[in-house]
Regions:
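N-terminal small/glycine-rich loop or linker at the start of catalytic domains
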Residues: 2-12, 68-79, 111-114
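Active-site acidic/histidine proton-transfer and metal-coordination neighborhood
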Residues: 20-27, 60-65, 80-175, 183-184, ...
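Histidine-acidic metal/acid-base catalytic patches
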Residues: 2-35, 63, 103, 158-177, ...
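Active-site-proximal loop/turn and secondary-structure-junction residues that shape catalytic pockets
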Residues: 17-19, 41-43, 75-78, 111-115, ...
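Short, solvent-exposed loop/turn segments at secondary-structure boundaries
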Residues: 48-52, 81-86, 118-123, 186-189, ...
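Glycine-rich, proline-tolerant flexible connector loops at the mouths of alpha/beta enzymes
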Residues: 39-62, 112-118
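Hydrophobic alpha-helical packing residues
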Residues: 58, 95, 134, 266, ...
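Conserved beta-strand positions in the central sheet of alpha/beta enzyme cores
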Residues: 38, 71-73, 108, 146, ...
């Protein structure tokens, strides 16, 4: 029985950080206590590029294994802002189709890259135009977009994330919180971002990093204020998803993704944080 002081959050994770094969992804996540998976790719193919047959096969595998999908981790908006609006609208429709086939409510997106010599303020209107177009599609498709604060996109610092959310003003656009990404752009996540973004925060991406060199480390071992954030989210009544996105391959020499070993390290590190905060993950 969960103590009265505890709450429960649904644990998920980026399956393709474990292996290209979704069967392996599911097995490892379930062994770590997760009942959800965040789908970015399967069989080495990005989610927006999977064929109808591949999507159907993936849906069948998930159903067979009793695994649900927390979000579609799409690449939408992770392109230069100079591309036409329609470029990402078309890809979002494919992501929305994948969400429907796999039974997911959320689609992770970004707010566009821009050239090194381009002043960030000069692209603001173009970004807002594109984000409004994406939100309109999301409303039409019945999904919710989660903006991730990726390093070097327009919305990589709290004020610009808030500007996007408030300017678009759509129930279909919310915030995915990534503490490591904030650290990598010099932001103190809890002190400088939490209060501003909490009203719109609907999804937690579990990643930590160091201010000194930007390296990603297991949750609670960096400067991302993971414990304070989890404690505050618990106090605020957050009951959403916590999705493991370790990015630990470099630290553990496992190649292009975390792999099962580093993913397990990441999961156990986050379990220590949640246990200290009185949060149970299921």
């Amino acid at each position: 029985m969960v103590p009265a002081t505890q709450v429960s959050w649904a644990l998920s994770g980026f399956g393709d950080e474990i292996d290209d094969d979704p069967a392996v992804q599911i097995a490892v996540l379930q062994a770590l206590g997760a009942s959800y998976i965040e789908v970015r790719s399967a069989w080495g193919t990005n989610i927006v590029d999977l064929s109808d047959d591949q999507l159907a096969a993936l849906a069948g595998l998930l159903k067979e294994k009793g695994m649900q999908v927390s979000a579609i981790a799409s690449p939408i908006g992770k392109v230069d802002v100079s591309l036409p609006v329609e470029h990402e609208v078309e890809r979002l429709r494919r992501a929305a189709n994948a969400a429907k086939v796999l039974g997911a409510k959320y689609i992770r997106i970004f707010s566009f890259y821009y050239g090194e010599s381009v002043p960030v303020d000069s692209i603001r209107d173009a970004v807002i135009e594109r984000m409004r177009a994406l939100a309109a599609v999301a409303e039409e498709e019945g999904v919710v977009l989660l903006h991730e604060n990726e390093k070097d996109i327009f919305g990589d610092v709290p004020d610009r994330v808030l500007d996007i959310i408030e300017s678009v003003n759509s129930p279909a656009l919310k915030v995915a919180w990534d503490a490591a990404n904030f650290v990598q752009v010099g932001v103190k996540p809890f002190d400088e971002a939490y209060a501003k973004l909490r009203p719109h925060l609907e999804y937690l991406q579990v990643k930590d990093a160091l201010f000194s060199n930007g390296h990603v480390v297991p949750a609670g071992e960096g400067d991302g204020d993971l414990l304070r954030t989890v404690e505050a989210l618990k106090a605020d009544g957050f009951t959403g998803f916590a999705s493991l996105e370790p990015h630990l391959a470099g630290a553990h020499g496992l190649g292009g993704f975390s792999g099962p070993t580093a993913f397990g390290i990441a999961a156990r590190a986050f379990a220590k944080v949640t246990a200290e905060a009185g949060v149970q993950t299921v």
